[in-house]
Amino acid sequence: MTGYEARLITFGTWMYSVNKEQLARAGFYAIGQEDKVQCFHCGGGLANWKPKEDPWEQHAKWYPGCKYLLEEKGHEYINNIHLTRSLEGALVQTTKKTPSLTKRISDTIFPNPMLQEAIRMGFDFKDVKKIMEERIQTSGSNYKTLEVLVADLVSAQKDTTENELNQTSLQREISPEEPLRRLQEEKLCKICMDRHIAVVFIPCGHLVTCKQCAEAVDRCPMCSAVIDFKQRVFMS
């Protein structure tokens, strides 16, 4: 699947919203399961495409460590995708705050080097900013170590996911299949899109792959951080 034409053939009579030529150029080929595609180089899988989504942008968003992506688009493109996405989310939130609170955030959070470090690891700007705000409000000071910040971010992401699942469960009368679909997607390996996630990467804390796919990588497919240790977990 290293060749563009070979990848393009796999799409056959592709009937989904994203252009198959763009998908093939971005390194993806169809795996024959609805609109699921997979990168020939990094093995990263994507599905549930929305109209007007850019395959290159989605590739950079979810698998920034892919060498094919890096060769074709470069580090600057990947960094811009993540930075633009983070700043767009932050702009809406910041404009809603009072001037005094905005100044306090700028003075205590934006100069903190751990803010950029967390973003480079794949965390969303607004999530990092929010958790730093909460830290300042409860303890009077910002984070001192990146390890503690990452641990709190991972914990917050887990709580958010559980809350979202609980909220969708209350909407079963409106859409009975939606909560189950989202739960299944949350638990799927982001590389093979087939088996359940089962390994946490240390130190970045991402839980995105099954045991088999985790054995084949030495960098986190989510944030491209070097993996020091792989911790097996068992999902209920």
Curated annotation (Swiss-Prot):
Keywords associated with the record: Apoptosis, Cytoplasm, Metal-binding, Zinc, Zinc-finger
Compartment(s): Cytoplasm
Gene: BIRC8
RING-type zinc-finger residues: 189-224
Keyword field contains GTP-binding: no
Spans of repeat BIR: 7-70
Physiological role: Protects against apoptosis mediated by BAX.
Top-rank taxon, per record: Eukaryota
Stored InterPro entries: BIR_rpt (IPR001370), BIRC2-3-like_UBA (IPR048875), DEATH-like_dom_sf (IPR011029), IAP (IPR050784), XIAP/BIRC8_UBA (IPR042579), Znf_RING (IPR001841)
Family classification: Belongs to the IAP family.
SMART domains documented for this protein: BIR, RING
Main location: cytoplasm
Tissue spec: Testis specific in normal tissues.
GO terms, biological process: apoptotic process; negative regulation of apoptotic process; positive regulation of canonical Wnt signaling pathway; positive regulation of protein ubiquitination; regulation of cell cycle
Keyword Chaperone in record: no
Disulfide bonds listed in the record: none
Record GO terms (molecular function): cysteine-type endopeptidase inhibitor activity involved in apoptotic process; ubiquitin protein ligase activity; zinc ion binding
PROSITE patterns assigned to the protein according to its UniProt record, in alphabetical order: BIR_REPEAT_1, BIR_REPEAT_2, ZF_RING_2
Protein name (record): Baculoviral IAP repeat-containing protein 8
A GO cellular component annotation in the UniProt record: nucleus
Subunit note: Binds to caspase-9.
Chain positions recorded as Zn(2+) binding sites: 39, 42, 59, 66
